[in-house]
Amino acid sequence: RWKIFKKIEKVGQNIRDGIVKAGPAVAVVGQAATI
């Protein structure tokens, strides 16, 4: 039971980490697209 919960927690952290890292890149791409 707890293994599944820990796996979900780890995946959630990875997704959050990816969003935090991708955020600035997405903003830069968005600015480049509007120019």
Curated annotation (Swiss-Prot):
InterPro entries in alphabetical order: Cecropin
Post-translational modification Isoleucine amide, affected residues: I35
BP-aspect Gene Ontology terms: antibacterial humoral response; defense response to Gram-positive bacterium; innate immune response
Keywords: Amidation, Antibiotic, Antimicrobial, Immunity, Innate immunity, Secreted
Presence of keyword Secreted: yes
Subcellular location field: Secreted
PROSITE patterns: CECROPIN (PS00268)
Domain of life (superkingdom): Eukaryota
Pfam families linked: Cecropin (PF00272)
GO CC annotation, single: extracellular region
Protein family (similarity comment): Belongs to the cecropin family.
Function: Cecropins have lytic and antibacterial activity against several Gram-positive and Gram-negative bacteria.
Name by which UniProt lists this protein: Cecropin
Naturally occurring in which organism (per UniProt): Bombyx mori (Silk moth)
